[in-house]
Structures are given as structure tokens and as C-alpha cells.
A protein has these predicted regions:
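Gly/Ser/Thr/Pro-enriched helix-cap/hinge segments flanking short amphipathic alpha-helices
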Residues: 145, 242-246, 295-311, 320-368
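Beta-propeller blade repeat segments, especially FG-GAP/WD-type strand-to-loop junctions
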Residues: 24-38, 79-98, 135-149, 184-198, ...
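Short consensus segments that form the blades of beta-propeller domains
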Residues: 17-18, 44-45, 73-79, 105, ...
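Short loop/turn motifs that recur once per blade in beta-propeller domains
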Residues: 38-49, 96-108, 149-159, 198-208, ...
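Beta-propeller blade termini
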Residues: 1-10, 50-61, 111-121, 161-175, ...
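Acidic/hydrophobic-patterned starts of short beta strands in beta-sheet-rich repeat architectures
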Residues: 10-19, 61-70, 121-130, 171-179, ...
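Beta-rich catalytic cores
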Residues: 23, 50-55, 81, 110-112, ...
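Asp-box/WD-like beta-propeller blade repeats and closely related beta-sheet repeat scaffolds
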Residues: 48-53, 72, 78-119, 152-155
Length: 368
């Protein structure tokens, strides 16, 4: 189902973390030219739970990224199995939510997506859980105990949460954009660590659409993040901020409705311009290049079309460390399907520079 990227075994190399949704969760490392699962511990594999979403960040400030697994065994409302927050001690993995002191803050509401947020800009992360049919959660660790801070931070909203991203959208702190179903989107402006929903004011509420995939991208290449938002069988959006409101500048080909599930924005071919990959379910995927001045150019895919693919998630990483990003697409939902892994054909003259910001605890500075 969902996919994230982290260095789970602290060997200096990234792994793809893939949720199983009734099948084992995977930690896929690049070994001898192949992707291989490197973790076999039951608490991580979690075969009996319907794991749908995943995010990684250092929530306990020890320099190692914990893994948040979002479980959903019902469509909406109360669920049977709670989420997991996987930590490591001497190469043994365990679930922080299973500790007695953390049980009162279990998330027992169905959800879809999860994202890490450095709300104070100090490297101390919280985890935003986009729930469906119940209040949003925002977990932090205080005094070595998991605490839900959503109500305190004005985040405990009830909606059909679908997709969520965090970054410097409006302020110099981490803001949050949440694409929702059967309700307005949220644009959560960071005000000194607390949040205010300004989606209506900035014209990104998109209330009649049903959000699915979303990503942040510098569409105008001007040094600020814009919003890519995909709607289920609805018009997709390329929101750029102009005169204190967002405008959709996507062309007809980009905006055209589809059964979208995931949006990825990255420079796949190392030419200095970002591409946007749209993963659709049971219809062809699409790829666009963002040229100068935010002009979207559709690139006709020969591979990665997946016309009969039941895509549910995707992520990018230079998993083999050759300077070219790999794209991993996960599948599932109504039908079990294998993972797919893609790489662009890159011109020899194209160059790359990879930067990995580190915070004061020695962990990846996500959202920097």
C-alpha cells in the first residue's frame, strides 16, 4: 500500500519501507543488484494488520528514525487494531505503542495517510495522522511518553482524510496541506507552532472534489514550495501562490480527471527540471515535465503505464547510489499485484547533486 524511505538499519543506505495491508510489511534494501527484504521480526512484518500508511522520522530525538505504521481495518470510524510506532534497541525492533504508558493514546480510528512535521523548526518531530471519520491525531513524545497534541494545536478536525504533506508552504516553519474526501481540504498555517486552517482564504479548499494524492513542488523554480493536488475522478490542481491566494496553473492535460492515487514530484532524468508522476488505478499513469514558468509538458510513457495496475502508493530514492532516482510503485486494494521499480534513461551529460540535511540530533532534517 503506502511507501516511505529511510535508513532503517543505520548502515548509511536508504531502504524502501512498504506497507502490506494484510500481507507482511517490507524493508527493501539494495543488495547484490536486487531489492531484498532485510527485516524479519514479527512486530515489523505485522501480517495480521491492515497497514495502509507509513512515515519515518526521529520522534524521540535519538538520531534514529522511528517508523509510524498506520493501520486501517475498516473504511471509516472506529477500527479494531491500533497503529504502530516502531523503534529499535540494539537491533531489536519494538512498538512504542505497546508500552503501558502509551496505551491511553492509541489511534483507534481508520486513517489513510501520515506525515512527519517539525512544527517548531528545532528538529523535534510530531506525526500528523490523517484519519477518516474521526479526529486527526498529532503525536509527539513528551517526558518519554507518546502524547496526542492535536486538540492543543487546533488540529483535531473530523473529515475524510486522504493525503497529507508538510513543508514551507506559507511560513518559514512547517505548514501542512491535507487533501480530504467528502469535505474541504485543509491548509494549516503554522503560527508559532500551532495551526490555523486557511484553505478557504487561499482558495485551496476544493470542497466539491475528493482529494487523493498530493505533493509539494517548486513549480515556478523561484525557491518556494507550491502544491500539487490530485482528485479522484476530478480535476487535478497545480497551485501556485500569487497575490496571497493560490491559483491552479495546470493545463488541460494535467488537470484532466483520472482515478488518481499518488503524485510524485522529482527530477528523474537529472536535467534540472522536475517531473510529476501521476499514479492512477486501473488506467494509464501519466508523466509531466515542469518547464520554465511552470509550463507542464506531457511525456508519453512507454514503460510505467500500468494500464491494469492497482496502484496505491509510490516513493523515490537513489536506492543503488548511482545518482539516478528510482521510482517504486506499490499495488493492492482490490487485487494483489507485485511491486514495480522504474528508472529514467539519463543523458550522459546530465549531472546531479544530492544534499542530505541533518538536524541537531543527527537524524535526517525532514522538511528542512
Amino acid at each position: 500500500y503506502g511507501v516511505s524511505v529511510t535508513d532503517i538499519n543505520s548502515d548509511g543506505k536508504n531502504e524502501f519501507i512498504v506497507t502490506g495491508f494484510g500481507y507482511p510489511n517490507l524493508a527493501l534494501g539494495y543488495i547484490d543488484g536486487k531489492l531484498k527484504n532485510i527485516i524479519q521480526e514479527d512486530v515489523f512484518l505485522d501480517r495480521d494488520r491492515k497497514t495502509i500508511g507509513v512515515a519515518a522520522c526521529d520522534i524521540d530525538k535519538d538520531g534514529f528514525e522511528e517508523i509510524y505504521f498506520l493501520n486501517t481495518d475498516t473504511y471509516s470510524g472506529t477500527k479494531k487494531y491500533s497503529d504502530r510506532l516502531i523503534d529499535k534497541n540494539n537491533n531489536n525492533y519494538f512498538d512504542l505503542f505497546e508500552l503501558k504508558k502509551n496505551i491511553e493514546n492509541l489511534n483507534l480510528t481508520a486513517g489513510r495517510s501520515v506525515v512527519c512535521v517539525d512544527r517548531k523548526g528545532d528538529g523535534e518531530y510530531g506525526i500528523y495522522v490523517a484519519n477518516y471519520g474521526g479526529p486527526t491525531r498529532f503525536y509527539e513524545i513528551e517526558n518519554n511518553t507518546i502524547t496526542d497534541k492535536a486538540k492543543t494545536l487546533n488540529l483535531d478536525k473530523v473529515t475524510g482524510g486522504r493525503a497529507v504533506v508538510s513543508g514551507h508552504i506559507l511560513t518559514d516553519r512547517a505548514d501542512i496541506f491535507a487533501a480530504n474526501e467528502r469535505g474541504a481540504n485543509f491548509l494549516l498555517k503554522n503560527n508559532d507552532g500551532k495551526f490555523e486552517d486557511v484553505a478557504f482564504d487561499y482558495r485551496v479548499d476544493d470542497v466539491i472534489q475528493n482529494g487523493r494524492g498530493t505533493a509539494l513542488s517548486d513549480i515556478y523554480y523561484r525557491g518556494r514550495l507550491d502544491i500539487l493536488s490530485g482528485n479522484w475522478n476530478g480535476y487535478h490542481r497545480a497551485y501556485v501562490l500569487e497575490n496571497n491566494e493560490f491559483k491552479d496553473i495546470g493545463n488541460k492535460a494535467f488537470d484532466r480527471p483520472s482515478r488518481i492515487r499518488t503524485i510524485i514530484s522529482a527530477d528523474f532524468d537529472n536535467d534540472g527540471f522536475d517531473e510529476v508522476f501521476m499514479n492512477n488505478i486501473a488506467e494509464p499513469n501519466k508523466l509531466f515535465k515542469i518547464n520554465e514558468n511552470g509550463k507542464f509538458e506531457e511525456i508519453k510513457l512507454k514503460t510505467a503505464l500500468e494500464t491494469q495496475g492497482f496502484g496505491t502508493g509510490a516513493a523515490v530514492a537513489d536506492i543503488d547510489n548511482d545518482g539516478i532516482l528510482e521510482l517504486l510503485v506499490s499495488h493492492g486494494e482490490s487485487k494483489a499485484q507485485p511491486l514495480t521499480l522504474y528508472k529514467a534513461k539519463v543523458e550522459k551529460n546530465n549531472k546531479y547533486l544530492r544534499i542530505k540535511p541533518i538536524n541537531k540530533f543527527g537524524a535526517p532534517a525532514r522538511g528542512a
